[in-house]
């Protein structure tokens, strides 16, 4: 068994861990060990590097932990997918590359929690900007020199994108030019983590590429963290497995857990930090009975509302194997063409009720009818909207099954456990149908494929959701920040009741954000990195941002085609 010593040990080279490894080693006298259970982000592997190939990593286990939930009691007892990234880049290596920061009011709401006063939107915005290089240039809301390449959709990519945005506006919802700028609410182009050369902009590419040659950073892949070591109440190191070999590394300063919303609570529990009764049931010595570890688990659930396309403008031909070599060759040689896009180039956020303070529904528009993981492709030209609610009141948990680090934990999101969940999904389906029936889509819109035009009553819509809704792959909040009885970490990611131990990833969100989670996770890591380094936080900015303040969610009077009566 080998033993070495570092200032910091980071468990997990994902969206947060790579940020910390890069920022901490900017100080040349600081040594960092970065442990990653997966392998390298092989740059020759089109499955992770080609944006259009985003479904492929979810279909195997080289890059995907392929977790599965326990039977979900409100979803026909289905065991549902819970894909998580494995390899340098973590989930930024296999995600959909949608760059969505969340709504300003998400962070303002966090800041109302005791101890989180410095997590307002205006406190967080400088760190979003620090991380970003946006292809159309910086402004008050966007960065121009950060590690993460962000590409903004341009007009003319596919007529369906513009038609779907126009349809949203014709239905009475706002148009927004920037879902990450002044106003998230509305429909518009979607930013994506794609490089100017058409490659996936994972945090391995953006952050580790600039840091991996530093002599004070050691990156160890295929290293599965087994447990955190403690000297009394202080984290002192980590034991990890590389194949059949066990190694131990000691931390002079801190152990930083960045393993994600599933594996971070799993590692803490395996190390003796978590609900005492759970640990004792597995004969794990209790270092600290911390009841919130693994609780408060949240996710986004979504549906695919699919339509036949009457004109041959969808991506359907690109799904055929005989067309894919040409697409792949153009992407490989030039970084252009269909392979260079994730094809989530338009979307939006709406409120379904006037009393919703900020958007509760997200849309991703896609010019093909297919499941996110590449399954169940409709054999015809089609298009779809991915539609889901943003802040479900339902809460789940991550619970250790055994002491074996190779065993997956018990995961229960408890999807659709509350009455509000059902109301929001019914509202979302009906709102989507109103959008899809607007004149902008008349030339393209054929019959409704899913749920199908005959699916109308509350009971029928609920049955569709139970049978067909899927995860958006946004697990979070299972080691939440705060100071209540179920909080796990403080506002700087430090685990309550212990020294030398932090959690820094999407698990520390107190409440899930409105949209995709990669951008907020990077921001969280950038912000806490300054705290770890003892640096003065970036100054709070002063820019305006949209607040509805009770304004109508939809201007029905301006809708080109009025709502149907059911």
UniProtKB/Swiss-Prot annotation:
It catalyses: choline + A = betaine aldehyde + AH2; betaine aldehyde + NAD(+) + H2O = glycine betaine + NADH + 2 H(+). Its EC number is 1.1.99.1, 1.2.1.8. GO terms for biological process: glycine betaine biosynthetic process from choline. Keywords: FAD, Flavoprotein, NAD, Oxidoreductase. InterPro entries: BetA (IPR011533), FAD/NAD-bd_sf (IPR036188), GMC_OxRdtase (IPR012132), GMC_OxRdtase_N (IPR000172), GMC_OxRtase_C (IPR007867). The keyword Iron does not apply. FAD binds at residues 7-36. GO terms for cellular component: membrane. It is an enzyme of class 1 (oxidoreductase). Pathway: Amine and polyamine biosynthesis; betaine biosynthesis via choline pathway; betaine aldehyde from choline (cytochrome c reductase route): step 1/1. Its cofactor is FAD. Pfam families: GMC_oxred_C (PF05199), GMC_oxred_N (PF00732). One of its GO terms (molecular function) is betaine-aldehyde dehydrogenase (NAD+) activity. It comes from the Bacteria. Residues 180-201 are annotated as: Disordered. The active site is at residue 474. Belongs to the GMC oxidoreductase family. PANTHER family: CHOLINE DEHYDROGENASE, MITOCHONDRIAL (PTHR11552:SF147), GLUCOSE-METHANOL-CHOLINE GMC OXIDOREDUCTASE (PTHR11552). Involved in the biosynthesis of the osmoprotectant glycine betaine. Catalyzes the oxidation of choline to betaine aldehyde and betaine aldehyde to glycine betaine at the same rate. This is Oxygen-dependent choline dehydrogenase.
């Amino acid at each position: 068994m080998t033993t070495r010593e570092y200032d910091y040990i980071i468990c997990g080279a994902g969206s947060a861990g790579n940020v910390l490894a890069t920022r901490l080693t900017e100080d040349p006298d600081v040594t960092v060990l970065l442990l990653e259970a997966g392998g390298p982000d092989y740059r020759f592997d089109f499955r992770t590097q080609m944006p259009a190939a985003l479904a492929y990593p979810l279909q195997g286990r080289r890059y995907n932990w392929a977790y599965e939930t326990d039977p979900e009691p409100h979803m026909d007892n289905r065991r549902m997918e819970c894909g998580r990234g494995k390899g340098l880049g973590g989930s930024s290596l296999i995600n959909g590359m949608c760059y969505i920061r969340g709504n300003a009011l998400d962070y303002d709401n966090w800041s109302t929690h005791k101890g989180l006063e410095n997590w307002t939107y205006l406190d967080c915005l400088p760190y979003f900007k620090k991380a970003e290089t946006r292809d159309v240039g910086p402004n008050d809301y966007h960065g121009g020199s950060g590690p993460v390449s962000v590409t903004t959709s341009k007009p003319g990519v596919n007529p369906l994108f513009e038609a779907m945005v126009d349809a949203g506006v014709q239905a009475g919802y706002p148009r927004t030019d920037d879902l990450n700028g002044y106003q998230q609410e509305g429909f518009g182009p979607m930013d994506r983590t794609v490089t100017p050369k058409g490659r996936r902009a994972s945090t391995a590419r953006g952050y580790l590429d600039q840091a991996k040659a530093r002599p004070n950073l050691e990156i160890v892949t295929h290293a599965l963290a087994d447990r955190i070591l403690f000297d009394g109440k202080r984290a002192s190191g980590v034991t990890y497995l590389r194949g059949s070999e066990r190694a131990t590394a000691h931390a002079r300063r801190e152990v930083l857990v960045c393993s994600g919303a599933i594996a971070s609570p799993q590692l803490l529990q395996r190390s003796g930090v978590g609900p005492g009764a759970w640990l004792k049931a597995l004969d794990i010595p209790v270092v600290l009975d911390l009841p919130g570890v693994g609780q408060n688990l949240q996710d986004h659930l979504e549906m695919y509302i699919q339509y036949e396309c009457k004109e041959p403008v969808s991506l359907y031909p690109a799904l055929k194997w005989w067309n894919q070599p040409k697409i792949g060759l153009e992407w490989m040689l030039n970084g252009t063409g269909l392979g260079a896009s994730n094809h989530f180039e338009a979307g939006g956020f709406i409120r379904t009720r006037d009393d919703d303070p900020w958007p509760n529904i997200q849309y991703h528009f896609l010019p093909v009818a297919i499941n996110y993981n590449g399954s169940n492709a409709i054999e015809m030209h089609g298009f779809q909207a991915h539609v889901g609610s943003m802040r479900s009141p339902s809460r789940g948990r991550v619970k250790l099954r055994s002491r074996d680090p190779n065993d997956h934990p018990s995961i229960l999101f408890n999807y659709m456990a509350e009455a509000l969940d059902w109301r929001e999904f019914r509202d979302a389906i009906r709102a989507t149908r109103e959008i899809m029936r607007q004149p902008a889509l008349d030339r393209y819109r054929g019959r409704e494929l899913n749920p199908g035009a005959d699916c109308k009553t509350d009971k029928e819509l609920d049955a569709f959701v139970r049978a067909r809704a899927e995860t958006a792959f946004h697990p979070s909040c299972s080691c939440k920040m705060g100071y209540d009885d179920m909080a796990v970490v403080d506002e700087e990611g430090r685990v309550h009741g212990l020294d030398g131990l932090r959690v820094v990833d999407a698990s520390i969100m107190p409440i899930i954000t409105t949209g995709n989670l990669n951008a907020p996770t990077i921001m969280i890591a950038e912000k806490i990195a300054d705290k770890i380094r003892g640096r003065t936080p970036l100054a709070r900015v002063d820019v305006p941002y949209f607040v509805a303040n009770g304004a109508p969610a939809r201007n029905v009077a301006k809708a080109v085609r009025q709502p149907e009566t059911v």
